């Protein structure tokens, strides 16, 4: 919503500014709107707005230039005309200039040689330079600066952009776009494996859930990103080397002799760009075990190995008509649940019960929409009626759908009202989103969730949980429901479900068997070692073209299927 409203609001303010300057004598108000619009764009979107506000910048510049022109005498001022032409040209070429300034790759926590000009001139500099030109014109109109000041400012920015063009042409013709610098830096670092990720900034949790366990492998590795927008947040959150490789050519430059294995945590479209390097071992981890289509996507056949939590993940492919070779699977458990505390007291014996409500997002397609937020109010009121405290932990991507975001806002309002009346310390919003899922799972006595990976994670605790069936086919399609209380999509049985969830809990014994089926039969002590050992084995294996004989899966400590 914020991404959509930003340019719309900026365009509206810019048009208003232009109308005022052309149709009224309120020049000060118009120029004030110019400055307010630029300041608002910077405040809301930082310095990463290159190309997003071309329309508003063009209108703002035109309005400021018109305000300046109205103060000029009737004769032609050639300095002003040239300056105006240059300024409007620079703004209209923001996207093209940004592409010239965009390096072939970016790195953080990895030593590379950077040319001095590229350290100074990048997409941020171009964006700020264009904003500065608009501010200069507005200031000149306010204090009646001579036109040669505008011309000098425009020429200065033009010289900077000309240097960018020359540097870009030289780099492309003589230095392979600078990709040789990346290869040399990686050869010096000698990574043994990569974590490859193609995703948007609001999905970085997919990386961070695996990062602690990859760090425990005690091997040199690099996080390879494909989406430019994700570079800054990921690079700021880890001390590990991070490389942005937006193109196929930059990926090719990242394949170095020390590299033996690549791990993946989603079904990103650009995974195929690096999977084609057959001398490497490619392992799909995914970002959770669930009944969503991502967990049985046929595209996973392109990977050499599929690390899965338990037998349920293997059977899921066959149950959904996906023919996946069994020798690709390796059962390694779900290391993220190693800190989940197993229940020791029946829920009926707990007086002040806390329930975690974890609705998922709407997904990108109809068949992946399992979101229960439309019936969330009914669920909350049944929990309130039984004196439960609620933790509402929504999916990080809930706000990507405006209707889901509105439902979530309504639920948060209901929680706030009940907290004010009852004194129960409900948790929602940023507070509930902080930390890891395991932290809230340990705090809760029961859970209500939609179809998502949080079910498998919570299953480890052996605590009672309910699952929403928004599409009406859950019981027959999903084995996890054997250990869950199922809420119908119309919420017609929610009262009965909550009674079982917080009362007798007749599915307690069944739930323990389902836990093994989904999360593997590994001892609680050292549970994550199954994954760590399997990952080390893959990393330590020689490259495929160096193999003298086929890899023996029987030597793996994790379960091979």
PLM regions: where:
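Active-site and donor-binding regions of nucleotide-sugar-utilizing enzymes
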Residues: 72, 194-337
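Short acidic-hydrophobic, aromatic-tinged amphipathic segments that line or gate anion-handling sites
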Residues: 241-250, 330-333, 425-432, 483-503
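Catalytic binding pocket for nucleotide-activated donors in carbohydrate/polymer assembly enzymes
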Residues: 453-519
